[in-house]
Amino acid sequence: MQEILKAGDIFKTYGTVDVLKGIDFSVQQGEVVSIVGASGAGKSTLLHILGSLDRPDTGWVKIKDEEISAMNDKTLSAFRNQHIGFIFQFHNLLPEFTAVENVLLPAMIGKRNLKEAENRAKDLLRFLGLDHRFTHYPNQLSGGEQQRVAVARSLINDPLIVFADEPSGNLDTHNAEELHQLFFDLRKTYNQTFVIVTHNEKLADLSDRKVVMQDGVII
């Protein structure tokens, strides 16, 4: 398998608190990797640095041989839009937009061909079981459906890698298990790569690899 992400010697301090203490991390294309550990272990901070939402104090991050940690803000923003997807605990769908329109937003920001993007948005929503929800607004969707729209949005630009931070944290057991299965369906169909921070042991155990963090280090 091809290495899609590699990071080395990642340190991060907030004030006087050392949050990350020399992290080395790598992911292969098509892998589903979970990051687990107690609250305060540094999981979300690491995810945000790997996904370019934050910068390390020292160390480096490469995605497909591009050193994103060395990019300026403008270059990094364009790279993030084109190659990185994100899913968070809260779906952050815009209430005034339909499901399809919400999915399209990253493609519109990236100035992609709108017709092609709309076709992909509908294909993704169909794959995620939402073909009957194209024109529904977020307040007309269940919690599980809202999060599936957020998953489709993360995939609209065909990213190299998707980072998910507690993606099922707000869902009941049934919807959480359905969402977890979708990650593996997406990997099987699209060879999609996922790095997932989770407290859900079932999801962590399903993953190809479980990375355990404690006090800012991988153990």
Curated annotation (Swiss-Prot):
Lineage start: Bacteria, Pseudomonadati, Bacteroidota, Cytophagia, Cytophagales
Subcellular location: Cell inner membrane
Keyword ATP-binding: yes
CDD domains: ABC_MJ0796_LolCDE_FtsE
Record InterPro entries: AAA+_ATPase, ABC_transporter-like_ATP-bd, ABC_transporter-like_CS, MacB-like_ATP-bd, P-loop_NTPase
Record EC number: 7.6.2.-
PROSITE patterns: ABC_TRANSPORTER_1, ABC_TRANSPORTER_2, LOLD
Topology with respect to the bilayer: Peripheral membrane protein
Sites where the protein binds ATP: 37-44
Subunit structure of this chain's protein: The complex is composed of two ATP-binding proteins (LolD) and two transmembrane proteins (LolC and LolE).
Gene3D superfamilies (UniProt xref): P-loop containing nucleotide triphosphate hydrolases
Protein name: Lipoprotein-releasing system ATP-binding protein LolD
PANTHER family given in the database record: ALPHA-D-RIBOSE 1-METHYLPHOSPHONATE 5-TRIPHOSPHATE SYNTHASE SUBUNIT PHNL, LIPOPROTEIN-RELEASING SYSTEM ATP-BINDING PROTEIN LOLD
GO cellular component: plasma membrane
